[in-house]
Design a protein with these regions (language model features):
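Non-catalytic linker/capping segments at the edges of enzyme domains
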Residues: 1-43
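HotDog/MaoC-like acyl-thioester-processing domains
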Residues: 1-5, 82-84, 94-129
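Short tryptophan-centered beta-strand motifs in secreted/extracellular beta-sheet-rich domains
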Residues: 90-92
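Active-site helix/loop of acyl-thioester processing domains in fatty-acid/polyketide metabolism
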Residues: 47-69
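Short structured motifs
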Residues: 73-78
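Short, well-structured alpha-helical interface segments that form or flank functional binding sites
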Residues: 46, 50, 83, 87
Length: 129
């Protein structure tokens, strides 16, 4: 997993969780301002669990599905953190919508300097009722 994280950080990957980077190019952008009361821990670091929650919120604001999909797989690669008061820029750089569900790769960057602090690859399946 460590080698894969290095490849993501360097932008040197082609396929992960069935998402093909070159074939599923995306361009949706979102901004998120983490809440100092809910998103950070006592050391003023963004909670690791909140990275995926932030990506899910951005996806929900972008694509409000009648039936929200359920998570089938997700990998997060952490490269840094953000300071209190700094906004995050989320770039959905690869996106796939299909019969079985959706997948996306989200690059999370600090708004202040554009430094990538996380890569989040998510695969979701459509809900069956």
């Amino acid at each position: 997993m460590g080698a894969l994280a290095k490849r993501f950080r360097a932008g040197d990957w082609s396929s992960h969780l069935g998402l093909e980077r070159a074939r599923h190019l995306g361009s949706h952008m979102a901004e998120y301002l983490p809440c100092p009361y809910a998103d950070f821990n006592g050391a003023d670091l963004l909670y690791f669990a909140n990275f995926q929650a932030i990506v899910d919120r951005a996806e929900w604001h972008w694509q409000r599905f009648d039936e929200p999909p359920v998570i089938a797989g997700r990998d997060l690669f952490f490269h840094g953190n953000v300071n209190l008061g700094e906004a995050l820029e989320l770039s959905f750089s690869a996106v796939e919508f299909g019969q079985g569900g959706l997948a996306h790769w989200c690059e999370v960057r600090r708004g202040s300097d554009g430094e990538k602090i996380a890569d989040v690859v998510t695969r979701k399946r459509w809900r069956v009722r």
